[in-house]
A protein has these predicted regions:
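Enriched for short, Lys/Arg-rich terminal
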Residues: 6-19, 38, 51-59, 63-81
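A short, surface-exposed loop/turn module that caps and links secondary-structure elements
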Residues: 27-53
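Generic hydrophobic alpha-helical segments
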Residues: 8, 25-26
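PIN/NYN-family metal-dependent endoribonuclease catalytic core
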Residues: 1-3
Length: 81
């Protein structure tokens, strides 16, 4: 999403380690599916998205669309706080 892309580009300026972690999480989603792999994946209640831990403070929220394309909703903060 545009929001997630903006957050990702912000991370590129702020913290390269976070960018590396986000990339690792995306690879895990691609390889392992929605709810398997690294980052403690979990479905979020009341929303049709899943979450993985980037850090204690930040989460990657995502899902697949009807064509099985990965959609990332956010990669900064904790469930869009």
């Amino acid at each position: 999403t545009p929001t997630a892309w903006q957050q990702y580009t912000d991370w590129q300026k702020e913290d390269k380690k976070i960018v590396k972690r986000i990339n690792e999480l995306i690879k895990s989603i691609d390889r392992d599916g929605l709810l398997e792999g690294i980052g403690k994946p979990e479905p979020l209640k009341y929303r049709k998205v899943c979450s993985r831990r980037i850090t204690d403070e930040h989460r990657l929220t995502y899902n697949f669309d009807s064509n099985q394309n990965l959609i990332i909703y956010s990669c900064k903060f904790h469930y869009e706080d």
